[in-house]
Amino acid sequence: MNRKHISSGSDFESKIGYSRAVVDGEYVFVSGTTGYNYETMTISNDPVEQAEQCFKNIEKVLIQAGSCIDNIVRIHYIYPNKLDFEPCWPVFKKYLINAKPAATMFVAGLLDEAMKLEIEVTARLNA
């Protein structure tokens, strides 16, 4: 079975030994993704804006892997503050209306207090 590792180029990946995404078999597994905007090197303080940026970041790596947003089959949402979850629902619906993946929401601390959420996905490769 072929395995392909996709890197964002972050030093953090090599420091702790992980990949931005891994393609294995017919699936791509995307690591937890935050709302950090890598073009501006900033992160919004608004959880809804961060959710939008999370999906932009996820979409970029899925395309690199040979997949797309509509192929997401599993999604995990991680929120430090559970009250930030519901305001993001319109963003989730916008991106996931076709995929309708299995979903779980966790409440847990994140690496940086500026991070209002993190999203991890599993998707099928394009047919």
Task: Describe each PLM feature range.
Residues 1-56, 60-73, 79-127:
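N-terminal presequence-like segments and the immediate start of the first folded domain
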